[in-house]
Regions:
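Second-shell loop/turn segments in exported
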Residues: 1-6, 37-44, 70-78, 140-147, ...
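Glycan-recognition patch characteristic of GH18 chitinases/ENGases
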Residues: 1-55
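Substrate-binding surface in catalytic domains of secreted glycosidases
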Residues: 2-9, 52, 75-203
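Short acidic, glycine/proline-enriched helix-loop-strand junctions
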Residues: 7-13, 20-21, 90, 94-97, ...
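Hydrophobic faces of well-ordered beta-strands that scaffold small-molecule active sites
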Residues: 25-29, 66-68, 99-101, 128-130, ...
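Short, acidic/polar
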Residues: 42-60, 110-118, 232-246
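Glycan-binding loop/region signatures in secreted carbohydrate-active enzymes
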Residues: 174-244, 273-276
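Acidic/aromatic/glycine-rich contiguous surface patches that form carbohydrate-binding/processing clefts
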Residues: 241-276
Length: 276
């Protein structure tokens, strides 16, 4: 099993720049195929091979840690995924590297949510990145928000309660995108919009209605016989999510992804939690 990387010369330059500016660098390692992921996780020799490559990669590029982003796994691979991280943990300890892992909200679909043993991951990793999105995703047959604040907070409580993840380990993942939903003859589809492009897509005369429970503006309009619905992510909705970090003493925030945002959102983040 080969871990393919695309850090390249530009990546090396970025790592050097980040370190010169006192940033820590944790590259993300992700999966792409459920059956191949299952094969790797279920075989000790393959897990060992991947772990060796991760350690070599961190050492070669002088990295500070690693972020494991395995999504879309079989529920039956839950224990083997935990085992993979348990085996990786001491190897990272030897080189002083941080281990973070991305997980979805509890109590969801088998291959999206039930494939994680959040309790064990919380005891193994330095940080648990809660991907607090998509509440209503691409496969949804119902239009809805990407990350309503009430839903986000409910799941934060689940991580801290039933999953027993330490608050200082829990990192709140915030989306820098939303979806524009299209309804035609009862059929629903959606496209992703970066928050920086929302005002370019929504008509200027469309009314924005504030939803107090979601902490979001909602817009609905018609065009050429198609009904469009958008739950807007902006400075106000993101601020509501950032407030959960201090409310529950969480370890910090993560974002998907950097270039989807705006200067005003980054300014807000800097003011709220001190990131520059």
């Amino acid at each position: 099993t080969k871990v393919y990387t695309n850090i390249g010369e530009e990546g090396k330059q970025y790592v050097n720049w980040a370190k010169e500016n006192n940033y820590k660098v944790w590259p993300m390692i992700t999966n792409s195929n459920m059956s191949q992921t299952s094969k790797m996780l279920g075989d000790y020799k393959l897990r060992e091979s991947v772990i060796n490559q991760i350690v070599d990669y961190i050492t070669e590029y002088n990295l500070d840690g690693i972020n494991i982003d395995f999504e879309g796994m079989y529920e039956t691979d839950k224990d083997n995924f935990s085992r993979f991280l348990i085996e990786l943990r001491p190897r990272l300890n030897e080189i002083g590297a941080v281990l973070s892992v991305d997980v979805t909200a509890p109590d969801g679909a088998p291959e999206w949510s039930l494939c994680y043993d959040r309790y064990t991951l919380g005891k193994t990793a330095d940080f648990i990145m809660f991907m607090a999105y998509d509440q209503y995703g691409v496969s949804s047959t119902t239009a809805g928000t990407t990350a309503g604040c009430d839903w986000v907070e409910t799941n934060v409580k689940k991580f801290l309660g039933q999953e027993e993840v330490s608050a200082d380990k829990l990192i709140l993942g915030i989306p820098f995108y939303t979806r524009i939903w299209k309804e035609v003859n009862g059929n629903v589809t959606s496209d992703v919009i970066n928050i920086g492009n929302i005002d370019k897509v929504i008509p200027s005369n469309a009314q924005r209605n504030w939803d107090e429970s979601l902490n979001q503006y909602y817009v609905e309009y018609k065009k050429n016989g198609v009904t469009y619905k958008v739950w807007i992510e902006d400075e106000k909705s993101i601020e509501a999510k950032l407030n959960l970090i201090s409310k529950y003493n969480l370890g910090g925030a993560a974002y998907w992804e950097y270039d989807r945002s705006t200067e005003s959102v980054w300014k807000l983040i800097s003011e709220k939690i001190g990131i520059k």
